[in-house]
């Protein structure tokens, strides 16, 4: 019997961990949307750990794309060029968009 393929969100998480590992421990969580109103996801990063939270109230594709966005933020935080949170772009600076563009395009080729 053919082994059942994991859900898209799990495949995306595993692909990111393997292909774009981070220099710290990473945990990925799904929370109910009432715990994070108006957000699909967020990331918390410190020197030893990264926590990514994605709302449960999304389909597999939307949750996967949100995970890629949050992973891109985490990768951006590891660059030697610091994020200027006070600028107009803030955390969505040109480096973030380069990282996000690369990841989302590769992911679309995988599915």
Question: PLM features: residue spans?
Answer:
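Short, solvent-exposed loop/turn segments at secondary-structure junctions
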Residues: 32-34, 72, 81-82
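Hydrophobic (often cysteine-bearing) scaffold residues that line and stabilize catalytic clefts
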Residues: 8, 64, 68, 88, ...
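Active-site recognition of the HExxH zinc-binding catalytic motif
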Residues: 65-78
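Post-HExxH zinc-binding segment in Zn-dependent metallohydrolases
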Residues: 81-111
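Catalytic zinc-binding patch centered on the HExxH motif and its immediate surroundings
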Residues: 29-51
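Zn2+-dependent metallopeptidase catalytic core
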Residues: 4-24
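Short pre-active-site segment immediately N-terminal to the catalytic Zn-binding motif
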Residues: 50-67
């Amino acid at each position: 019997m053919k082994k059942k393929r994991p859900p898209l969100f799990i495949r995306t998480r595993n692909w990111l961990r393997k292909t774009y590992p981070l220099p710290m421990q990473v945990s990925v969580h799904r929370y109910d949307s009432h715990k994070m109103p108006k957000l699909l996801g967020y990331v918390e990063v410190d020197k030893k750990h990264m926590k990514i939270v994605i709302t449960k109230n999304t389909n597999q594709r939307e949750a996967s794309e949100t995970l890629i966005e949050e992973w891109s933020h985490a990768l951006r935080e590891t660059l030697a060029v610091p994020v200027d949170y006070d600028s107009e772009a803030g955390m969505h600076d040109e480096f973030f968009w380069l990282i996000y563009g690369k990841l989302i395009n590769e992911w679309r080729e995988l599915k």
